[in-house]
Amino acid sequence: MSKPKRERSLPDNEAKAVARMLRVSPQKLNLVAQMIRGRKASAALADLQFSRKRIAVDVKKCLESAIANAENNHELEVDDLVVSQAFVGKGIVMKRFSPRGRGRSGRVFKPFSQLTIIVRQVEASA
């Protein structure tokens, strides 16, 4: 016997996608997340397409996943989607050593991040 389905935490007009283990610091990822917050999904995709930030490719992939979730899983209209939330969380931090002069060593931190994108369908203004 299977477990009962969990209640959906989002409203019916929203869909989300999560990208984990992104190899970038949360501070740098938040710069790209700020660009797309509150924008139409199509405009946000265009911004990410021409962004010069390295992580914009992964953010675009996560946004496309959120749009696909909205379309296929929740039957939302793609043309009416807006990025309602895009927030960044800290992931793990890998610690490595770098050789320094005179037999010493220095620590190198390699941070990871998590990205959550929530898209919402807004009513088309007539």
From Swiss-Prot:
Claim: Acyltransferase is one of the keywords in the record: no
GO CC terms of this entry: cytosolic large ribosomal subunit
Gene Ontology molecular function terms on file: rRNA binding; structural constituent of ribosome
GO biological process terms on file: translation
Keywords: Ribonucleoprotein, Ribosomal protein, RNA-binding, rRNA-binding
Entry annotated with the keyword Ribosomal protein: yes
Domain of life: Bacteria
A Pfam family this chain is assigned to: Ribosomal_L22
InterPro entries: Ribosomal_uL22, Ribosomal_uL22_bac/chlpt-type, Ribosomal_uL22_bac/org-type, Ribosomal_uL22_sf
Similarity field: Belongs to the universal ribosomal protein uL22 family.
Role this protein plays: This protein binds specifically to 23S rRNA; its binding is stimulated by other ribosomal proteins, e.g. L4, L17, and L20. It is important during the early stages of 50S assembly. It makes multiple contacts with different domains of the 23S rRNA in the assembled 50S subunit and ribosome.
Subunit structure: Part of the 50S ribosomal subunit.
Name of this protein: Large ribosomal subunit protein uL22
Native source species: Bradyrhizobium sp. (strain ORS 278)
Recorded name of the encoding gene: rplV
